[in-house]
């Protein structure tokens, strides 16, 4: 236990080589917070008696009630290593005291935006996997996100006590189950890893995988056991580590190692991992759980475990907890693994800099980030806002990448839309004070050097959710985070009492600040719309809104899903539109964009900010576009980064560049609100074929061009077999065999389609994967639990947009019904306007 003072932490912050910033990531309910507890307990913040129950990082009341983590929280831990261990660290270190900034992040799929925010400020990740359930859909999503941010993973296989007590497996089965889990993690890592990182796969024999039980508070790595045995037998530790995993066997008769399963006489040999690592654990479990009073003291003496007075009276599970905690304390194994195998900021920023920074890789800011230099200009990324204890104020939570941040320092606050050299989205203000985040508490601190995680007070009015703070005039922004989920479920919110309206508006502002993945907007009919990533996410957001941010009673409409409008074919004739003064004409056609191009745009692979030549090269090589077309992409829409494109295919038009801005503005408007029912367009490419313009500049201003281009876009769109797309969830359901029938019946009722069904080897559980339209997903969890007697656990994550095959313009079809309902709700005319309304005759 360490009694911390802020000064001690501050002095550690200066030795950046000894800092580790890491997050804990996992599938929901695989035990992140419980494991985090055993670490926190060592750092001396919660008392030993409460660990395992305290779930220290779940700071919110609803987290403690629901037993899930919703927001990610940060804590600093302190650890000292012995000199032998420090020698094994492959990077530069200074002394043997280490500061670990740990962020516990939610595992529930609806909150993966929180995970993204946590990942941005860390360099390493502790991936927690359940022994029994193995790698699940969310483990994969989060691992993929972290590898895209160039974050190095280490793995903990948790809940080993379940395998021993509930499933009563044999040693060999347990080994096989471990090795399968490690293999499936490595498959994901090798699929998504970045070459820059080198080999980041995890290997038990190198000590990058730990095994343990968060609830009982014990864990071990192969390295720890190798340590014990190398002292006992006088062998080299490195050699011992290699032998304690994989196909290596020890023959006790000949005292020799072999890699064959049988000895010379054909008798089976026991695998070294089972014999040296699992055997003592299995024996302890057997002796204690079967109440063998005489064996216990003998075993404890052999393993050098000393029980105190009243601990000798315990029996059964309580004794097991105490003994295992003394034999293999979880914190030792995890801290050792974190310190040995995760990179320090100095190491990590070297290869992460170009991915974090938007500007050129040779400007002073980027070089300072690369070197993690505390003396250069400040570069700080704010990844999220954390609500303070007094209503309505937020701490900005972020990481210093270069320079030193001080209380009272004047900084440039750059929002996500800031462009160097321009004034918009830029404030120059002083930071009131800096604070250390410690789970439920904060400690004020004077300054904080590069490589550390910090909270700032007094800049929450100037930033919406994320942004860059800097003191360097020419600095570009740090790159914006890519979220793996998109807000697709929306509700309309009204106040019950009209006098409360200003409070609601204020509350919505705060809500959108506190959650990185909520969209708050206002519809034309004056409704306030809140969009989230799924049912649970929305429920929590609205609960926050009602209780904290606005503090007033609300009326909430049933949830509605966001659709997209798209086209299937090319326009059947050229769409022509004339300007209001009849002096300008625009001719264009619409056509669909391939799904993979749309995905590449949404995933940021094809980026509107990239150099147009480089972008054209990618589109030509990978997606088969014509190079001249790819170079002449005028813009992406909506919002300047969506999956719709304007391509200029005109030949020798006079004054064309003067109207480019107006055309782009009109396209943004048209794609944000399509003609069918006012939803965004997706995968629509508009080719401008010809433009006739008036010779005088005054007759071709924005007021003439913008409405014309919008009408032409609509006409071209409606001529090109318009369709609508609905969002689809990928559902992963884990259940025992007898519950499968119930799952299928619920899925069939909800237009779901099953993609795969497989049994997890060595367990009675089946995993069913299916696609479920989000529109049908409301109340799905409840119905599923009813149909299966509460045995099935669904995990839903947004997967893709699926085009509805039927014609949205015909009210008798499925798509037409959706369109009609949406138009009624928004107070539009009931029938969709025909293309003739937007088309002008010559």
UniProtKB/Swiss-Prot annotation:
InterPro entries: EFG_II (IPR041095), EFG_III/V (IPR035647), EFG_V-like (IPR000640), EFTu-like_2 (IPR004161), G_TR_CS (IPR031157), P-loop_NTPase (IPR027417), Ribosomal_Su5_D2-typ_SF (IPR020568), Ribsml_uS5_D2-typ_fold_subgr (IPR014721). The keyword Glycoprotein does not apply. Residues 17-253 form the tr-type G domain. Pfam families: EFG_C, EFG_III, EFG_IV, GTP_EFTU, GTP_EFTU_D2. Keywords: Cytoplasm, Elongation factor, GTP-binding, Hydrolase, Nucleotide-binding, Protein biosynthesis. Belongs to the TRAFAC class translation factor GTPase superfamily. Classic translation factor GTPase family. EF-G/EF-2 subfamily. Catalyzes the GTP-dependent ribosomal translocation step during translation elongation. During this step, the ribosome changes from the pre-translocational (PRE) to the post-translocational (POST) state as the newly formed A-site-bound peptidyl-tRNA and P-site-bound deacylated tRNA move to the P and E sites, respectively. Catalyzes the coordinated movement of the two tRNA molecules, the mRNA and conformational changes in the ribosome. This is Elongation factor 2.
């Amino acid at each position: 236990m360490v009694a911390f003072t802020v000064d001690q932490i501050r002095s550690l912050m200066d030795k950046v080589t000894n800092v580790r910033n890491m997050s804990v990531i996992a599938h929901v309910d695989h035990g992140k917070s419980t494991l985090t507890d055993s670490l926190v307990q060592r750092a001396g913040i919660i008392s030993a008696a409460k660990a395992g129950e305290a779930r220290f990082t779940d700071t919110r009341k609803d987290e403690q009630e629901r037993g899930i983590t919703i927001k990610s929280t940060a804590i600093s831990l302190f650890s000292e290593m012995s000199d032998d261990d420090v020698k094994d660290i492959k990077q530069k270190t200074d002394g043997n005291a280490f500061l670990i900034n740990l962020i516990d992040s939610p595992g529930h799929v609806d909150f993966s935006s929180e995970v993204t925010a946590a990942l941005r400020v860390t360099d390493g990740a502790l991936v927690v996997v359940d022994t029994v359930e193995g790698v699940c859909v969310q483990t994969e999503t989060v691992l993929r996100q972290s590898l895209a941010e160039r974050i190095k993973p280490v793995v903990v296989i948790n809940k080993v006590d379940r395998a021993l007590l509930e499933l009563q497996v044999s040693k060999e089965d347990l080994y096989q189950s471990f090795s399968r889990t490690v293999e499936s993690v490595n498959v994901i890592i090798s699929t998504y890893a970045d070459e820059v990182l080198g080999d980041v796969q995890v290997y038990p024999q190198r000590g990058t995988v730990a095994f343990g039980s968060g609830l009982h508070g014990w864990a071990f790595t192969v390295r720890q056991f190798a340590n014990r045995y190398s002292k006992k037998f006088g062998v080299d530790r490195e050699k011992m580590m290699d032998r304690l995993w994989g196909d290596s066997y020890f023959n006790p008769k000949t005292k020799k190692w072999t890699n064959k399963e049988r000895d010379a006489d054909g008798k089976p040999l026991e695998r070294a991992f089972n014999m040296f690592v699992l055997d003592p654990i299995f024996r302890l479990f057997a002796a204690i759980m079967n109440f063998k009073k005489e064996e216990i003291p003998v075993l404890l003496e052999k393993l050098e475990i000393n029980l105190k007075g009243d601990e000798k009276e315990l029996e059964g599970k309580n004794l097991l907890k105490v003994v295992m905690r003394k034999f293999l304390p979880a914190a030792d194994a995890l801290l050792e693994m974190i310190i040995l195998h995760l990179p320090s900021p100095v190491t990590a920023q070297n290869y992460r800099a170009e991915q974090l920074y938007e500007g050129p890789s040779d400007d002073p800011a980027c070089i300072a980030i690369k070197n993690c230099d505390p003396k250069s200009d400040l570069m700080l990324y704010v990844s999220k806002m954390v609500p303070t204890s007094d209503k309505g104020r937020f701490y900005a939570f972020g990481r210093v990448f270069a320079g030193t941040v001080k209380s009272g320092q004047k900084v440039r606050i750059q929002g996500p839309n800031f462009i160097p050299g321009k004034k918009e989205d830029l404030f120059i203000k002083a930071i009131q004070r800096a604070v250390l985040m410690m789970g439920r508490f904060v400690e004020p601190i004077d300054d904080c050097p590069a490589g550390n995680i910090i909270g700032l007070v007094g800049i929450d009015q100037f930033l919406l959710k994320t942004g860059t703070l800097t003191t360097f005039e020419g600095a570009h922004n740090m790159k914006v985070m890519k979220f793996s989920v998109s807000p697709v479920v929306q509700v309309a919110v009204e106040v019950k009492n009209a006098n409360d309206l200003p409070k609601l508006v204020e509350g919505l502002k705060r809500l959108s600040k506190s959650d990185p993945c909520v969209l708050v907007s206002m519809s034309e009919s004056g409704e306030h719309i809140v969009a989230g990533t799924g049912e649970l996410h929305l429920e929590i957001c609205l609960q926050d809104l009602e209780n904290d941010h606005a503090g007033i009673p609300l009326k909430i409409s049933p949830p509605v899903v966001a659709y997209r409008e798209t086209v299937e074919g090319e326009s059947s004739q050229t769409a022509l539109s004339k300007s209001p003064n009849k002096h300008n004409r625009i001719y264009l056609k619409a056509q669909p964009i391939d799904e993979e191009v749309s995905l590449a745009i949404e995933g940021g692979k094809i980026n509107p900010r990239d150099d147009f030549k480089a972008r054209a090269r990618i589109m030509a090589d990978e997606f088969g576009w014509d190079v001249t077309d790819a170079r002449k992409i005028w813009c992406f829409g909506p919002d300047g980064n969506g999956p719709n494109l304007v391509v200029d295919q005109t030949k020798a038009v006079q004054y064309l560049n003067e109207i480019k801005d107006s055309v782009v503005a009109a396209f943004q408007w048209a794609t944000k609100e399509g003609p069918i029912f006012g939803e965004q367009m997706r995968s629509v490419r508009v080719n401008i074929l010809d433009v006739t313009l008036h010779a005088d500049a005054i007759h071709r201003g924005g007021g003439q061009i913008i409405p014309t281009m919008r009408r032409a876009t609509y006409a071209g769109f409606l001529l090109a077999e318009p369709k609508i797309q609905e969002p689809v969830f990928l559902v992963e359901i884990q259940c025992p065999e007898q519950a499968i029938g119930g799952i299928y019946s619920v899925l069939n009722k909800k237009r779901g389609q099953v993609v795969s069904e497989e049994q997890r080897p060595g367990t009675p559980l089946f995993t069913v994967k299916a696609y479920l339209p989000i529109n049908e997903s409301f109340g799905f969890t409840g119905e599923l639990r009813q149909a299966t007697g509460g045995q099935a656990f669904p995990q839903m994550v947004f997967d893709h947009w699926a085009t509805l095959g039927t014609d949205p313009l015909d009210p008798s079809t499925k798509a037409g019904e959706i369109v009609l309902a949406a138009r009624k709700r928004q107070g539009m005319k009931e029938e969709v306007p025909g293309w003739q309304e937007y088309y002008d005759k010559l």
